[in-house]
UniProtKB/Swiss-Prot annotation:
Subcellular location: Cell inner membrane
Induction entry: Induced by BasR.
Cellular component aspect of the GO annotation: plasma membrane
GO molecular function: carbohydrate derivative transmembrane transporter activity; transmembrane transporter activity
Transmembrane segments: 3-23, 36-56, 77-97, 101-121
Organism whose genome encodes this protein: Escherichia coli (strain K12)
Stretches in topological domain Cytoplasmic: 1-2, 57-76, 122-128
Name this protein carries in UniProt: Probable 4-amino-4-deoxy-L-arabinose-phosphoundecaprenol flippase subunit ArnF
Length: 128
């Protein structure tokens, strides 16, 4: 059950991260504070996506709280690395994100996935 909550948390956090990235690239920079505030108050699509991203992170924290009650800490924190993989893939697949493929990034993803498999593969107990 803890693994399920952890996966929910990772998926929701990944979507939230993509939402915040979209909002950050479309809203005025915070260095132009009044333009930024005006865009937020207009509550256009960019501001709504920003709000959804923030709410997504909040929901992700709830799922993470449930994860930590059910799953060993050493396994739970390893799950967080899945978010890097999901966001990398989504940035290349989703239109408008212009994520780039590189062998270096693929190697990093392979390392993350290998590490997760090592952590989550069942262990066999040896009898002596």
């Amino acid at each position: 059950m803890g693994l399920m909550w952890g996966l929910f948390s990772v998926i929701i956090a990944s979507v939230a991260q993509l939402s915040l990235g979209f909002a950050a690239s479309h809203l005025p920079p915070m260095t132009h504070l009044w333009d930024f505030i005006a865009a937020l108050l207009a509550f256009g699509l960019d501001a709504r996506i920003l709000l959804l991203g923030l709410l997504g992170y909040l929901l992700s924290v709830f799922c993470w709280y449930k994860t930590l009650h059910k799953l060993a800490l050493s396994k739970a924190y390893a799950l967080l690395s899945m978010s890097y993989v999901l966001v990398w893939i989504a940035s290349m697949v989703l239109p408008g994100w212009e994520g780039t493929f590189s062998l270096k990034a693929l190697l990093g993803v392979a390392c993350i996935m290998s590490g997760l498999m090592l952590i989550f593969l069942p262990t066999t107990k040896q009898r002596y």
